[in-house]
Amino acid sequence: MSYEQEPEDGPYTRWVQSTIQNPRKAYRAMFYVAAIFFIVTTLFPFYWLLVLALTPLARISNMGLVPKGFNPGSFVEMFQLLPFHRYMFNSIAIALTTTVIVLFIGSFAGYAFGRLEFRGRTGLLLLLLAISYFPPAAFILPLFNFFTGNVSVLGVSSPSWFNTPGALVTPFSGLYMPLTIFILTTFYGQIPDGLEDAARVEGATRIGALFRVIMPLSAPGVATAGVLTFISVYNEFFFSFLMTDGQAQHWAPIVWGILNYQGQFQAYYNLMAAASIVGVLPVAVLVVIAQERIVSGLTAGALKE
């Protein structure tokens, strides 16, 4: 009498059976797959920029996933061909100025919306929310006419701010103000009233209590709003393209500098890649320094005690 041997289970079948018995394996596998996918899709563009920057210009047309040649001189040549350091300075200066203005004004607005009771508060918040939904392109025509001196009120023409930092800082401040106000309103509203009352008893005014008590206790929210504003302004190009002529001495930002490596007859892709890598360093350093504040700010801002 012969017995048929049952076929042995394959590795996939055994893994499925073990997963059914222990669901944590499935969750762990899903986590690893998602993490690997996120890491690859996030880091690959930076790797490709590095390959472009290190590949000699003559070999870029035949390049693959690894550099064909090794030419670190691109990181030096990029400063020799254009004053890229000036473009970086322009972006950093405009981003810092906008961030300070947005945080200063947004702090007062956040304090008013988060800690004061007044008629029409909800309506004003909804109005801010509605304004933030407008695309930036909707404001470009009136802003361009205003900043080029083509608007006249009672015979007085608007100032000509074309190719000046004011033409960039002003729209950026208005564009990123609503998000900052919403973040700070949430954080300021969570501070116990007793802490502010104690400062008021000691003789502090409302403004003094805001800067001495409310803002220090809301440091994660302030840092989050500041970093998000800085990064957004640093990377912005739409308004900069229309409000400047692309010259470094006229406050053109970093994206203008990268695009200027593309000439009429030739594009220096290796220099564009090198400039992109150098240009992202200030933002990367800022995020590394403030990452704990950003994470705590983004998570704590969604919770209420």
Annotate the PLM regions.
Residues 2-13, 28-305:
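A structural signal for multi-pass alpha-helical bundles of membrane permease subunits
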Residues 14-18:
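Short glycine/proline-rich turn/loop motifs
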Residues 21, 25:
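Conserved catalytic/binding loops enriched for acidic/polar residues
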